Regions:
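Unchanged
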Residues: 1-253, 364
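Left-handed beta-helix
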Residues: 1-12, 198, 206-370
């Protein structure tokens, strides 16, 4: 089905605190990923691939890079005369605003009231996955649910608060717990929901009138028994970015061909802002293996098991292993990096050695010189 009757809402700053190293200067949605993407590209592309033609991006702070990346939405075919892409920034300047999902939704209530769509898909930007939103919306409508909660089966992230679900044979949620971590075989929410627009507006208005602030605690958990809450099992590959370690592991997972094939599906492409650069240059002494190297790079040294973004230069004699080098990074001669994440425009000078671990990668701030 084509979802012209569905509104998409993206929360670009939700979970910023889990990735503080990278979100100090940008929203979580604009965190670089996989050599050429930003985290918001995945849920935004999922919406577009499902035919959702009106998407609101809810922002809180540090959203300049997000606006630069998305622009008018042209790369996602959302630069339209009618509907298309909407940025929804804070409307006030008090510290109490937008400190949770309910406050964010309360702040965009005029936008919701003026939208003609009947259903709303709400998604956080910490989900890396190519999910069929078409099927998700169809299941929501067919079940007659008040809220559909997308979940994965497996071990939930131990470093964030998870919504753990128990469901009946028909998918209806019979019990719910909110806690950090959880058993190895859990049904845990991934921050993706479908609701009727009117139901969402009523729930938010009620929560605000009672000074409730948590969507999960006050709209979901409080109403397990008196609302029709249904679970939807996401079978596609999904990685939840909740910490620097999980960010590192999610990037490294792209070096696995099976993961790439699940994430980048030809019938449901992941769109991003196009930057026209020359292909990467590989010198006579370059050695590159099991790595993703974006265009515009200049590789003269050794790169193994790494994610290399655009315009990265690795000088002769330098060795880069198990690293994520973001745009504009320069690794000078005879330096050795292992399990290192460099933010944009970092310079690693000659003969430097930096060594982290996959469970604790070394992070270098944007523009730093080491």
């Amino acid at each position: 089905m084509r979802n012209n009757n569905v509104l998409g809402l993206l929360f670009s700053n939700m979970h910023d605190e889990g990735l503080r190293e990278l979100t100090g200067i940008r929203a979580l949605g604009s965190v670089p990923f996989g050599g050429r993407y930003r985290l918001i590209d995945f849920p935004l592309s999922n919406m577009v691939n499902a035919g959702i033609s009106k998407v609101g991006v809810i922002t809180k702070s540090n959203y300049q890079s997000l606006m630069d990346h998305i622009g008018s939405g042209k790369s996602w075919d959302l630069s339209r005369k009618n509907e298309g892409l909407y940025f929804l920034p804070p409307f006030g300047n008090t510290d109490e605003l937008y400190n949770g999902r309910i406050a964010s939704l309360s702040g965009i209530m005029p936008f919701l009231r003026n939208s003609k769509e009947e259903y709303v898909v709400l998604s956080d930007c910490h989900i890396v996955g190519n999910i069929d939103y078409d099927r998700l919306v169809e299941e929501h409508i067919a079940s007659g649910a008040d809220v559909t909660i997308a979940y994965k089966k497996g071990a939930p992230p131990a470093d964030m608060e998870n919504v753990l679900l128990w469901t009946a044979s028909d998918g209806r949620v019979t019990d719910m717990v909110i806690r950090s971590g959880g058993p190895e075989e859990s049904r845990y929410g991934i921050g993706l929901y479908v609701m009727g627009k009117e139901e969402l507006m009523r729930a938010v208005d009620t929560a605000v009138s009672r000074h409730h602030g948590s969507f999960e605690w006050d709209i979901l958990l409080r109403h397990v028994e008196d609302k029709r809450l249904y679970g939807y099992c996401v079978n596609e590959y999904v990685s939840v970015i909740s910490s620097l370690e999980r960010y590192f592991r999610a990037n490294m997972a792209l070096l696995d061909a099976e993961v790439r094939n699940e994430l980048f599906v030809g019938s449901r492409p992941i769109y991003t802002k196009v930057r026209d650069c020359a292909p990467a240059l590989y010198g006579l002494h370059a050695s590159v293996s099991n790595s993703l190297v974006a265009d515009g790079g200049d590789i003269q040294g050794t790169v193994r098991n790494s994610i290399v973004f655009r315009d990265v230069k690795v000088d002769r004699g330098a060795v880069v292993e198990n690293c994520i080098l973001m745009q504009g990074t320069l690794v000078c001669a005879d330096s050795a990096l292992n399990c290192v994440i460099t933010d944009k425009n970092v310079v690693i000078k000659d003969d430097r050695t930096l060594h982290g671990f996959d469970s604790y990668p070394v992070f270098i701030n944007k523009g730093s010189v080491v």
